Amino acid sequence: MSASPETSSDPPMQRRSRLSAERVLNSSLELLEEHGFDAFTVAEVSKRAGISVGAIYARFGNKEAMLRAVHAHGIERMVEQHAAAASPDRVADDLHACVVDAVEMVASVFHGNEALLRAFMRLGAVDEVVSRRGSAGSKDLARRFKEKVLAHRGELVHRDPEVAVDVAYRMAYCIFARRVMDGPAYESDLVISWDELVDEVAAACSAYLLERRTGVTTA
């Protein structure tokens, strides 16, 4: 863990530079959340952060490099959220409760960062570096989902618990990602609230993981 600005032994100029960069990154995240990727401008970031456009370019080089740094900063923040949401203090007593908890964990990351993730997804579509980093963040969330559910491995009826839990994660991830990217009525006219959607996805994942299916061997 890095030292805080107040306790850091960095020279004052270096410390000021780091704090200025943090202001730029945080202002950029706010701008992306409020107005999305298409409306993002260095001039607006400059105004919000109180740092000149020239100083921003001197620090980051160009807009592409700046957006990559902003994305890295945002993903780091989300990974911290993953860790908090997957806290060992929240271990469920049985598989059903554990699946519900795991699905709610995934939903909370998407719902809590809806506008920012939408901007990141659009940026990732045109920037391979951003896409790879976003994939790594998604896989971190997958790992935490699997750790939660596989803590009750003995209750799983699927012949391959690892595959089953991976598919359950993909179900939740893809449904919530689609909701964030395209809104509640892209693929269907029926509009479902976030809370109801989370409940239904949790029920679907629980049914998939808990119910024995005709003709499927568990050996």
Task: Name these PLM-found stretches.
Residues M1-L19, P184-A185, R213-A219:
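N-terminal intrinsically disordered/low-complexity leader segments
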Residues S8, P12, A72-C98, L117-R118:
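Amphipathic alpha-helical linker/stalk segments
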Residues A86-A92, G112, L117-R118, L123-E128, ...:
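Hydrophobic alpha-helical bundle segments that form small-molecule/ligand-binding pockets
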Residues R118, A151-A202, R212-A219:
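Hydrophobic/aromatic-rich alpha-helical bundle segments in the mid-to-C-terminal region
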